[in-house]
Every structure is written in C-alpha cells, then in structure tokens.
Amino acid sequence: ARNERRRAREAASSKSDSHPTGASPPPALNNTKVKALFVHLRKIANHPLLVRSRYGDEEIATISDVCHRRGVFGHEATLAKVESHVKSLSDFDLHQLCGEQGHLSNLCLSPAAFSGAAKTSALVDLLATIKAKGSRPLIFSQWKIVLDILEWVLREKGHRFVRLDGSTDVHQRQQICDAYNKPGSEIFCFLLSTRAGGQGLNLTGADTVIIHDCDFNPQIDRQAEDRCHRLGQSRPVTVHRLVTAGTVDERIVQIAERKLDLDAAVLSDTKVMAAEESKAMHSIIEDLLG
C-alpha cells in the first residue's frame, strides 16, 4: 500500500511544473492551484486508483486509438483530443472504460489493485471483524467515486450492500432505508455519501459507523454518526475513522479535532467554513512543500 501511494505521488509530481536546481522558486500558489493540489493529495490518501499511475503511455495510446476508432467520445473528436481526455482520467476511470469496451478488457485492473490500498485493506479486515460479531456498518465517504470503488470491493468480498448518495431518487431513499432496517435483513453494509446521507435518515439497523474520509468540519461527520444514534437504537454504537498515516488525512483530522471546541453555529456558517478550509489547505500544502 505504501508503494502504491509513493507511485501515485511520483506520477502526480511528474505532471507538475518543476524548476531546475539553482533556479528561482516558483511563485506562490493561488487558491485554485492549492485546492487542486490538495484534492489530488486527498485522492492519493483515499485510494491510489483515484489518480493515474498504473496506466502508462503505451496503454494510454492503445486505449485512445480504440476509443477514437469506435467513436466512444463522439465521432467528431480527433485522436489528439481523445488522447488528451484519456490522459486526464484516473486509473479507476480507465479500468471502467476498458471494461466497457470489449477490445480493451485485457487492460482491466486485477482485484488486488482495489483491495491492496491502505484504507481498503484496513476496511476489508474491519468488515470481517464486524461481520463475525453480528454487527452491521454504515460506511460514509464524501466522494461518490470512492463509493464506486467500495462497491467493487464489497462485491468481490461477497458482502451484500445498498447505497445512497446525492443521485439517489428522493422517492427511493426511504425504501432503501426500510430494506436495510427491516428485522432480519440480510443486507450487511450501507454505503452513503457523507452529505447526502448525513441528515434526516434513521438507520438504527446498523450499530457501527465507518467514516472512510473525514471532513474538515467535524459537525458533518457527527451528523453522519447520528444516523445510528436515533430513536429505536437499542445497541451500543461504535465509530471507526480511517486515516492514512503520513498523508493529508492526518492533518485534516487534527484540524477537525481543534474545531470541536468551536460553537456549532460558527461551524454551520458556510462562508466561515469555506474560508477556514482554504486557510487549512494552504497551511497543509506549505508544510508538505517545506
């Protein structure tokens, strides 16, 4: 898993502008660049497949050629435009694209590429322990693409699950929750996006909460945790937070813990929180750049 993160970071840094030894350092990063870099580092911490490091130039050329000839991105798109787009995709996106195109299925990633990442490996072990105890978990992530990856892992491990995120039809949400909460339900896991699933839902069918990636605002994660702490819950609730050591994850958790002392009204002010997050991103990036 550590090698995966290092390879992803190296791939990311190779795409960044660099300056020769002895040259003047680059100008300070603006907010847009800081946010983009920070998001990139968060992706690496969550799962290396969220960036591109496994698909090299040869694979990119093959994928681009097939997609161009088959008009996957529109028959009017030139090969150069197709290749430019394909290069911008993450390993997971490319894996899905290859799976959709029969001629490229040989380029799909192996199961080890999904479950070998640090967080995913820890999650797989944790789920085995939870299942053995007869417990059932809610798994929250801020990223829909992370939920996509977790779906793949859960299927591979044979866990039954349901999912709810921002794209879930409003009329289906209660049906999904009812199916999970139903006494004797054989659905083991409930995947939720932190914001979409963080309010108004009663999910007392679970007694375990797993926060896959923490939010800068601790109140957001607490709202997610509260899905288990609702009227009708008769069991103790256990909360797990997955944090990748040596990454921006650790700093986010530290910042969130400091904010717990702030008034809830302040934390609910979107303008204040946006400014706080921007400041935190700058601080973290500056520390990483030394």
Regions picked out by a protein language model, each given a short descriptive name:
Residues 1-70, 78-290:
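ASCE P-loop NTPase motor core, strongest for the SF2 helicase catalytic module
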